[in-house]
Swiss-Prot record:
GO cellular component: bacterial nucleoid
Protein name: DNA repair protein RecO
Record has tRNA-binding as a keyword: no
GO biological process: one example: double-strand break repair
Reported function: Involved in DNA repair and RecF pathway recombination.
Family annotation (InterPro entries): ARFGAP/RecO, DNA_rep/recomb_RecO_N, NA-bd_OB-fold, RecO, RecO_C
Protein keywords: DNA damage, DNA recombination, DNA repair
Organism: Beutenbergia cavernae (strain ATCC BAA-8 / DSM 12333 / CCUG 43141 / JCM 11478 / NBRC 16432 / NCIMB 13614 / HKI 0122)
Gene that produces this protein: recO
UniProt similarity note: Belongs to the RecO family.
């Protein structure tokens, strides 16, 4: 396979030499791909502006030994234009693409569900369909679920006892009954558990109707759950403006 086409989200870029950029892409069919875009930093470049983070693109690449080479680009959804000018949207989108990069670290391993989740989340941000923090927390929960780390917010994560329950532990997988609850477990409000379940399921009517107190509490639990499974903190998450 020398030349191939795919859709992609630009996760990250950095400069190479005087005129080139190295791109980290999450593609629809080929997973995470690293590629060089030659000459895109020149003002005469035909597609430099199309290769900014958060954009959804259709591109043709030449498969190289270490880095692929971008040979053609078309814009499918210029979400970056709507996102980069708004601090809340920008920091939220940055946390999303950093998460996507971490969850798809094995290059060229297909990750179509992760790609589709990210595209949908970026679209929701760009269209301001919901509060940015809700979109972020929903994306984080669902992307972790796709990666095999789905939390439970109703039945006990340890013994499967039917809920609802009032304790939460990120290391143990979510909600816990009184018998399984370890010392120091969080005790979120019942409304927070409902919100978390709605965000995981994509129940936007319930999520949009939630109040700020429960949004803040749910965001803290989502961040703890994410950090536990990624085994490190997202650099970008600390900059996100929480409700």
């Amino acid at each position: 396979m020398k030349l191939y086409r795919d859709e992609a989200v630009v996760l990250r870029t950095h400069k190479l030499g005087e005129a080139d950029r190295i791109l980290t892409l999450l593609t629809r069919h080929h997973g995470q791909v690293r590629a060089v875009a030659k000459g895109v930093r020149r003002t005469s470049s035909k597609f430099g502006a199309r290769l900014e983070p958060f954009g959804v693109i259709d591109l043709q690449l030449y498969a190289g030994r270490s880095l692929d080479v971008v040979t053609q680009v078309d814009t499918l959804a210029p979400h970056g234009r709507s996102i980069v000018g708004d601090y809340a949207l920008y920091t939220t989108a940055t946390a999303m693409v950093e998460t996507a990069e971490r969850l798809t670290e094995i290059e060229r391993e297909p990750a179509t569900q992760q790609y589709l989740l990210l595209v949908g989340a970026l679209r929701a941000l760009a269209e301001r369909a919901h509060a940015p923090t809700l979109v972020l927390d929903s994306y984080l929960l669902r992307s972790l679920a796709v990666a095999g780390w789905a939390p439970t917010f109703t039945d006990c994560a340890r013994c499967s006892r039917e809920g609802p329950h009032r304790a939460f532990s990120a290391p143990m997988g979510g909600a816990l009954c009184q018998a399984c609850r370890p010392p120091g477990a969080a005790a979120p409000a019942a409304e927070t558990f409902l919100l978390l379940g709605a965000l995981l399921a994509g129940d936007w009517a319930l999520a949009d109707a939630s109040d700020e107190r429960h949004r803040r509490e749910s965001s803290g639990l989502v961040a703890a759950y994410l950090q536990w499974h990624l085994e490190r903190q997202l650099r970008s998450l600390r900059h996100v403006e929480r409700a």
